[in-house]
Regions:
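Short, compositionally biased strand/turn segments
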Residues: 5-25
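Acidic, Ser/Thr- and proline-rich intrinsically disordered linker/docking segments
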Residues: 1-3, 7-8, 27-97
Length: 97
């Protein structure tokens, strides 16, 4: 099982043949990993506070699946390797068919 925690109390989980997005510990999206079709990445650099409270680097990934679910996820840039590992697992599940 692979998982990565993101912003807004969200988590992505790849567990065998299933991919799931959780928010606050509750499942919001659960789809077969083999239905994965692609991902779009965006790097974000933004201010933390309203009045110059420092900057933070984030990565946003949008995942597309057969049948319509589109999953957006935002995490610290330091977690990019964890996200890439989940995407590699989704790619291998897709090509295993």
């Amino acid at each position: 099982m692979q998982s990565v925690d993101g912003q807004f109390n969200e988590r992505l989980v790849l567990d065998g043949e299933w991919f799931e997005k959780l928010r606050g510990g509750q499942s919001k999206t659960r789809v077969p990993a083999s239905s994965f079709r692609g991902a779009t990445w965006q790097d974000i650099d933004r201010r933390k506070g309203l009045f110059g409270g420092g900057r933070e680097s984030l990565v946003q990934v949008t995942l597309e699946f057969d049948g319509g679910p589109v999953v957006g996820f935002l995490a610290d840039a330091a977690k990019r390797t964890d996200l890439e590992a989940i995407l590699a697992g989704l790619e291998s599940a897709r090509t295993a068919l």
